[in-house]
């Protein structure tokens, strides 16, 4: 999907890691939503409260998911699924700016 039509964009940003990771919520007419984010180069650790599909629109990163012990290379456009894991984290290492959205 190259664009979202007929949506509401919540102005308030979710800001993490001293401003190096930020996101905005995109609300659709049917009540669903997505999160559109920007991640600057760096290393980050995230937990998930629900299953998430992450679509990397551009950029290059390495990820390590909780059920894995190896790094996986992701180059946008590409997606991956992060299962619910409140007690475990997944890790990112970015070498270039990344645009992504969560479904």
Curated annotation (Swiss-Prot):
Catalytic activity: a purine D-ribonucleoside + phosphate = a purine nucleobase + alpha-D-ribose 1-phosphate; adenosine + phosphate = alpha-D-ribose 1-phosphate + adenine; cytidine + phosphate = cytosine + alpha-D-ribose 1-phosphate; guanosine + phosphate = alpha-D-ribose 1-phosphate + guanine
Taxonomic superkingdom: Bacteria
GO molecular function, one term: guanosine phosphorylase activity
InterPro entries documented for this protein: Ppnp (IPR009664), RmlC-like_jellyroll (IPR014710), RmlC_Cupin_sf (IPR011051)
Alphabetized UniProt keyword annotations: Glycosyltransferase, Transferase
Enzyme Commission number(s) from the entry: 2.4.2.1, 2.4.2.2
CC per GO annotation: cytosol
Family to which this protein belongs: Belongs to the nucleoside phosphorylase PpnP family.
The protein's role, per its UniProt record: Catalyzes the phosphorolysis of diverse nucleosides, yielding D-ribose 1-phosphate and the respective free bases. Can use uridine, adenosine, guanosine, cytidine, thymidine, inosine and xanthosine as substrates. Also catalyzes the reverse reactions.
Stored PANTHER family: PYRIMIDINE/PURINE NUCLEOSIDE PHOSPHORYLASE, PYRIMIDINE_PURINE NUCLEOSIDE PHOSPHORYLASE
HAMAP family (UniProt xref): Nucleos_phosphorylase_PpnP
Record protein name field: Pyrimidine/purine nucleoside phosphorylase
